[in-house]
Each structure stands twice: as C-alpha cells, then as structure tokens.
Amino acid sequence: MSSGTVLDSILDGVRADVAAREAVVDLATVKAAAKAAPKPLDVMAALREPGIAVIAEVKRASPSRGALAEISDPAELAKAYEDGGARIISVLTEGRRFNGSLDDLDSVRAAVSVPVLRKDFVISPYQIHEARAHGADLILLIVAALEQTALVSLLDRTESLGMTALVEVHTEEEADRALSAGASVIGVNARDLKTLEIDRDCFSRIAPGLPSGVIRIAESGVRGTADLLAYAGAGADAVLVGEGLVTSGDPRGAVADLVTAGTHPSCPKPAR
C-alpha cells in the first residue's frame, strides 16, 4: 500500500464518497436496512455447480480503458447475462473511475434470480452493511487495499451478515494474507491495481498454492473461450468477465459461448 499509486488515488475518492453517504444515511439506518433485506443467496452452491462458472460484470468504465460501454439499462444487461448462463452477476458500484452506483446494484438485484456481487473498493463496515441493504450476496475485498487487521475484520463482518467474501489477490504474499484471514473464495486479478499492468501468468503462479477447498476465481484478461480454457487448465473454478462482455455487441451470446466452453467435456475440471 505504497503512496502515489493508482489504487491509492481510487481509495482516496472512495473514502470521501463513503463519508458523504454516511453523512446522509447513518450506519444505524444502513444496518437496519441490511437486517430487513431478504436473506442472501447461496453463493458457494452456485460456484460449486459442475463446470467453470461465469461471473458476468456490469461495467461502464475502468481506470485503464476509460469509458467502455453506455449501459442505459443495467437490469436489461444483467438479465441477458443470466439468460446466457451466468451464475453470478457482478455490479461495479464505484462512481469516480468505473461510473457505477448503488442504483445499478438495486436495478440488477431486482432483475435477476442468481447471486449478485457488489464490486467496489471496500474499506469500511458501512459499505458491507450498505451492500447487504442493497441486495448483494457477495462482496469484493481487495487485499492490496487493506491492512491485515482490517481484512480480517471486514471478512468476518461480511460472513456475519450471511454474505460471501470474494477476496482479491495479485501476488503470492497477498494470497497468503487472504488465507490467513480465512478466505474461502479467492480471486486472482491479473491486473495490478497499483500500476494497472496486466500479468496473464499471475493466476497460474498463484492458484497451485491455494488449498483444494478454496474456490479459485480468475479475474481480468478473459477475452474469449481460449482464455477461459487456459484459466480452467490452471485450476480456475470460475472466471469473472467484464470488458469482454460489455464491448461484445451480444452480451447474452458472449456469456453463452463462455458457459458452453466451461461445461464442455473437454474443459479441464476444477480440482474440488
């Protein structure tokens, strides 16, 4: 967590935005809304179904590429993903760099019956209760963004609300920290959030060192079925795909192609 990185800049904005939201809706109110929300869906069951799971992302923009897609109706896009066979829908809710919002999360949650991931830079318990209040079943925790005590605390809080934590890593050291914190679902992001550079060998280096009981998700760099199959061969249980879907012109078909490849008899099987 060195100063001056892209990640640091994003986190500065997130802190300001969380403080602004909490000034309008306090933690007690958000906790009450989270408690009143429908029970979270079973994410682990979705990830353990046969084949490579596809997590399809509602993603308007990114720090590395800028604007990606004009998504006027996130619910319609999410439904197309679900119809294509996506097992989980990921929704970016960070506004400054990704043009996402909690309104997007609300729209998607109302439109689909599969689990929904809140994809954001979570640094505060407030965001976890907020995610639950808005219907998230799964929440992203980024190891590079958190000190170890905060990671452990936020992971525990996520699970105490019945949600599942997707704990994201980019290095072997971060993977060790994720395991020490008790992560049962680990995402290996090929993109270094501090520099935005892609390392496509990142997953194949880190995944073999993860215990067999841990769900392994490959993040970033999935451009099509060949990438899915490569990640499957390296031990992936699931792939998270955003840019490749929102820029495809046929999101339902693009998801369906990945799902077909991930469930084909020739596809390498996850080591569960």
UniProtKB/Swiss-Prot annotation:
Key word rRNA processing present: no
Pathway note: Amino-acid biosynthesis; L-tryptophan biosynthesis; L-tryptophan from chorismate: step 4/5
GO biological process, one term: L-tryptophan biosynthetic process
GO molecular function: indole-3-glycerol-phosphate synthase activity; phosphoribosylanthranilate isomerase activity
Family annotation (InterPro entries): Aldolase_TIM (IPR013785), Indole-3-glycerol_P_synth (IPR045186), Indole-3-glycerol_P_synth_dom (IPR013798), Indole-3-GlycerolPSynthase_CS (IPR001468), RibuloseP-bd_barrel (IPR011060)
PANTHER family: INDOLE-3-GLYCEROL-PHOSPHATE SYNTHASE (PTHR22854:SF2), TRYPTOPHAN BIOSYNTHESIS PROTEIN (PTHR22854)
Organism, as annotated: Mycobacteroides abscessus (strain ATCC 19977 / DSM 44196 / CCUG 20993 / CIP 104536 / JCM 13569 / NCTC 13031 / TMC 1543 / L948) (Mycobacterium abscessus)
Keyword Glycoprotein included in the entry's annotation: no
EC identifiers of the protein: 4.1.1.48
Catalysed reactions listed for this entry: 1-(2-carboxyphenylamino)-1-deoxy-D-ribulose 5-phosphate + H(+) = (1S,2R)-1-C-(indol-3-yl)glycerol 3-phosphate + CO2 + H2O
Protein name as annotated: Indole-3-glycerol phosphate synthase
Top-level class of the enzyme under EC nomenclature: lyase
SUPFAM superfamilies: Ribulose-phoshate binding barrel (SSF51366)
Gene3D superfamilies: Aldolase class I
NCBIfam families: PRK00278.1-1, PRK00278.2-4
UniProt keyword list: Amino-acid biosynthesis, Aromatic amino acid biosynthesis, Decarboxylase, Lyase, Tryptophan biosynthesis
Family: Belongs to the TrpC family.
